[in-house]
Amino acid sequence: MKRISLFSWVLLVCFNLSAQKQPVTAKLSDNNSFSMILLPDPQSYIKFDVNQPIFELMTAWTANNKENLNIKAVLCTGDLVEQNEWPVPDNVNGNQTSTQQWQSVSRSFERLDNKLPYIVCTGNHDYGYKSSENRFCQLSKYFPVERNNKWKDCLVSVGKNWEGLPTLENAAYELELDNWGNILVISLEFAPRDEAIQWAKDLVDSEKYKNHKVLLLTHSYMDEDANVYEKEGYKVSPANYGRTIWERLVYPSPNIKMLICGHAGDVGTFDRHVSYRIDKNQSGKNIPQMMFNAQTAGGGWHGNGGDGWLRILEFMPDGKTIKVKTFSPFFAISPTTAEHAWRKTDIDEFEMILE
C-alpha cells in the first residue's frame, strides 16, 4: 500500500509540474465548434531579437491549445520577415540579418510542425531585398512543401512562382469539417501575377472544388479604412492588387465565401490595425473581407511586434457563422497583465455569416 501511495504521489507531482496553469484560458462558446487561429504579420516580432520570443510564444500557445479550442488550421497573413535578403541590419528597422529572420520565423512555426496544418502567405517584405524590389523570395528554402506532415492530407494544389517552380507562395488546402462540409483555403502570393490569379480561378471553377466553401488568404488587399487597393507603389512587376483580386477572382466566384488579409496598419489606436467590409459577389451573396495586422500595437513600427495579438475564429455548428475574438497569449500568461488578454470592442469581437 505504501508503494502504491508513493507511486500515486509521484504521478500527481509530475502531472502538476507538466500542466502549466495560466490566469486566462481561451474557450469555445460551443463544444461542437471548431476553430482556426489567425496570426497577423510577424515581421516586427522577427526583425528584433528581443521580440522574437513573443511570436514563438504565440505559436507555442496555439499548439498547446489544439484540443482545447479544437483547432483545425492556423492562418498567417504574411510578411514573415522584415527584409528578405539584407545582410547588414541598420539597427533601426531591425537588428537581425535576413538569414537570422528567416531562421527565427521558421523556428516559431516548428512549434506547429506535425501537429497542425498552418497556411502562410507571402507579403511584400518577403520579396526582393527589403520590400518587393523583385520577385525573389526565400520561402521555399525555409518552408518546403515536405516540411510539415500535417500538409500531407490537406495540401491539394501548389501553384508555380515567378521562376516556374511549385512553392507554397500559391497553395490550396482542403479541410473536411463536421457541419461545414469541405473547405478549401487558398493562399495567394503578394501582388499576384496574372498566372497566379488564373491558377486560383481555375481551381475554384473546377468540378472538384466548385461546391467547396473557399476561404482566400492573401497579404495585401485593403487598407485600415477598408478601402480596397487599386494599386500600390512597389517596384515588383507584373503585379495585381486588391481591386483586381476582387474583380477577377472573388466577385465572379460563387464558392469564394470570405477573404482574409493583413499588410495595412498605422500607429495609433487599435482600430488602425484592423478593418472589415462586406460586398456582394456576382451571385448577390455577401462576402466578408477582414484585415488584421496588429504589428504596431506594441509600441509602433519599432515596438515589441504587436503585443501577442491573434484572432480565434470559431466556426459554429450551424455551418455558416464564424465568431471572431481577439486574444493575446502574451498578456494571458501573467496575472499582472491577464486583465488585458481579451479585446472586447465591436471591432475586436464580432460575427461573420458566410452565405
Predicted regions and their residues:
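Bacterial Sec-dependent N-terminal signal peptides
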Residues: 1-22
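N-terminal active-site segment of His-dependent metallophosphoesterases
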Residues: 19-97
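A short C-terminal boundary segment appended to hydrolase-like catalytic domains
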Residues: 30, 303-355
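Active-site environment of divalent metal-dependent phosphoester hydrolases
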Residues: 45-47, 82-84, 122-131, 168-171, ...
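Extended active-site neighborhood of metal-dependent phosphoesterases/phosphodiesterases
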Residues: 86-198, 209, 269-291, 311-314, ...
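Active-site-proximal segments of metal-dependent phosphoesterases and phosphodiesterases across multiple
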Residues: 90, 94-98, 195-198, 207-257
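Conserved beta-sheet core of the metallophosphoesterase superfamily
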Residues: 237-317
